[in-house]
Structure formats: C-alpha cells, structure tokens
Amino acid sequence: MITQHRIVAGLGELTLTVSSVSHVGKVREVNEDALIAEPPVFAVADGMGGHAFGDRASATAVLALHEEFDPTVPTEPGHMLTAIRRANAAVRELTAWAGDDRVIAGTTLAGVALVVEHPAAIPHWMVFNLGDSRVYRWDTTAVVPRLERVSVDHSVVQELLDA
C-alpha cells in the first residue's frame, strides 16, 4: 500500500509518499515484524525469534509509538526519546504479564522520525535503533545510487567488533 502524507513544519510543508511491506519469509511460520509508516515516525520492530511473544513484542512497540504522535506535524527529539522509552516499558510489561521468568518478550526497533527543535525550526530526520535492526538511506548523489547504512548495531557482536 502506498500512502501520501502532508506535514506542516516550520515555515512550510512537506509531502511524503510512503510504502511499506513485511513478509514472514521462508523459514518461520509467524511474522515477528511490525512496522509503523505514519508521520512523524517510520520504523520497524523485529520481534526476537526463539523467544515467546516475539510477534506481540514488536506489535506492542509499534502500537506504543503510534499512540504518541500527531501525524500532521513533526515531533521534538525529546518526545521521540520518551516514546521509545514508553515502547520499551510496554514490551517489558508483556514479560511481567506472562508471569513466568522463563518467558522473555523482546524486539528490536529501528527507524527515523521527522523532528524539529522548536516550532519555527527546519525539520530534520532523527535516526534511532535498538538492537541489531539497521537503518539505511538511499543515496542518489553517488554515481551509482546505493544504500548507505546510517545506524550502528546495538548488540554484543558490534561491541566485540568495536573493541
């Protein structure tokens, strides 16, 4: 599905054309991905496979983000960080709700948000990621357009690579 969004920001307006899709793949029976593609947030949550509630964890994180924002205006960076914390708290509540210490609900979260520092500021993109899901940008300024990674994995493997 392709959608168009009009956003009033600062001294002007921005029109975004957005498309999103998720697929279970060839190995798993349950799609543990959830996504939000509605201004000001565009993100994917990848439920942790092998853990109970991976699909619920990703859906919970995305729903928490969806409930935080007005889709017609950018948000502030601080509000985005608060929304991520609330999404994390909602996922942690799933684990508590299960009532079993062996049940762990978890998800990665990666995306971008359209943010402004103050109402008259020019909006810009804020990149965020938790876990090993990545954020890329499509670079059309290169001789051959290419995907360029803009996030750094938040994982033990990345810590070992950085050491």
Spell out what each predicted region is.
Residues 1-163:
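PP2C/PPM-type serine/threonine phosphatase catalytic domain
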